[in-house]
Amino acid sequence: MTSSRRRTTRKRGSWLLSAVAAVAAVGTPRPVIAQAADLTGAGATFPYPIYSKWFADYATVAGVKINYQSIGSGGGIRQLTEGTVDFAGSDAPMTDQEMARLKTPVLHVPTVLGAVVITYDLPEVTKPLKLTGEVVAEIFLGTIVKWNAPEIARLNPGLALPSKDILVVHRSDGSGTTYIFSDYLSTVSDSWRSGPGKGKELQWPVGLGGKGNEGVAGQVKQTPYSIGYVELAYARQNNLPFASIKNAAGTFVTPSIESVTAAAAGIELPPTTDFRVSIVNAPGKAAYPISSFTYLLVPKSMSSAKKQKALTDFLKWAIHAGEKEAPDLDYAPLPSYVVAILEKRLDSIARGAAP
């Protein structure tokens, strides 16, 4: 790793730690805006690094304290359904069945885009690996079990791959990151599609479980010869390498802000979209194939008009001022046409009837 890369990684890690510390330090809103309503949310760990920064910044800007529990997309949807939080975070769009269980209809509000990366710990290998979706699927199915297996070696000529067992690490909780990962594998691998399939929680054939993106990253970091999947920001924060993945155009693409943006450019959403879309395996030579929107799930009406306004105002701030902070934390900002759709959608949210 170059000294420039190390400085960049340290900067990102310090930025994230500062953001999390700032969230923890937020206390009672300043007296001049003490009437602002506080908000509670829970859900996805995938976007937590940028949400931490946003919530800290918005507390300073607007005096609104937002308490967000990074517990995984499945847990966030469950708490939203039970009515114990004001909003939820999820990388997986809600299914029709999940939405039918809600007391109040919700909007899917995309916030940023990110990449799920295939990260690993190979002490002998310093050059980034190249992998295909089919090979990744066979590794996580337990069919490919050695790092020097022919399927991996053919993709990485010249690399001295060790004859070591591959130790698979996956999520143990209900996870939007797992949803994105399994959505991609189901798209490119018949074996995966007919096996574990797509979902926030899976029956894993092999491997160790880690809770949250941070749990998987930590497990991979401390386990030689392991492989896992995490959001790009978590790999960078933990100084973990990640593979280039062969995309739909046949190009090996490194996950980055630019390649995630290219994946989003491969689709055009209509003004009537509900944003429940997949962009995995998107067309285009520059597109990273395991890319996704992440969402805040926002009730269309709330019992408290004050909270409704506070949440809507925060979202309007996030899709404008907040988007500018996305690249520093390894997320891609929303395309401008998506922001334009969201502006109209947020204006349409009904105000709560009670204060």
Annotated model-derived regions:
Residues 11-16, 85:
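A short, flexible low-complexity segment enriched in Lys/Arg and Gly/Pro that occurs
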Residues 14-28:
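Bacterial N-terminal signal peptides
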